[in-house]
């Protein structure tokens, strides 16, 4: 297992926050960021999934795991929900110790991560709840459309809120559109393969399945 790949990205965040705010604010932000990812890790380990690497990037952390067998989307939803829950715990703590910086940072992280925009936790929470009733592909497609709408709205509002959100919104809109286009391309290839196999083996029953072995949180 390779732990904490991408430390340079985390250092970049730390230095950028020091430049804009101060070192105390930067320490609280990075600590809250790591605490958020730690709660994802705790839930993943509690379900006995194997963690391959933890990758810290400027736009959020990624925990790569290997699933030996399929599992309920509800488990994935709980794992994605664990990160914002960690921020909620720190938010409660901020009221106890009366820390305005801790309160503001974790309130923003809590609300921001629950937005249904890819690659935020809120997006994958919604995908997995919909996947309880719909095929995963269609749940993903619906959520990508929602993600594009929300990211576009955030991009429009960002200049009136904070210019940092302008960069984030642009990034999230880009990956949402890219994933939407890629998923259409993937489905086309899958259907083409199914048609080819059915033509070559007209008497064979074809059951296309997708087994997800590696997930990112």
Model-based region annotation:
Residues 1-217:
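Hydrophobic transmembrane alpha-helices and their immediate loop junctions
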């Amino acid at each position: 297992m390779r732990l904490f790949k991408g430390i340079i990205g985390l250092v970049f965040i730390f230095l950028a926050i020091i430049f804009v705010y101060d070192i105390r604010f930067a320490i609280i932000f990075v600590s809250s960021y790591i605490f958020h990812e730690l709660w994802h890790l705790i839930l993943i380990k509690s379900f006995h999934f194997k963690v391959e690497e933890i990758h810290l990037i400027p736009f959020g952390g990624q925990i790569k795991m290997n699933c030996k067998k399929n599992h309920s989307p509800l488990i994935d939803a709980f794992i994605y929900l664990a990160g914002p829950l960690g921020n909620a715990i720190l938010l409660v703590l901020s009221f106890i110790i009366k820390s305005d910086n801790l309160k503001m940072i974790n309130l923003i992280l809590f609300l921001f991560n629950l937005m249904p925009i890819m690659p935020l936790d809120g997006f994958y929470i919604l995908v997995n709840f919909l996947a309880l009733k719909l095929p995963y592909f269609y749940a993903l497609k619906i959520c990508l459309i929602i993600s594009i709408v929300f990211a576009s709205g955030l991009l429009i509002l960002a200049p009136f809120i904070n210019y940092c959100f302008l960069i984030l919104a642009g990034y999230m809109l880009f990956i949402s559109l890219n994933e939407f286009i890629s998923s259409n391309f993937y489905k086309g290839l899958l259907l083409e393969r199914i048609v080819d196999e059915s033509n070559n083996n007209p008497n064979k029953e074809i059951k296309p399945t997708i087994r997800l072995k590696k997930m990112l949180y």
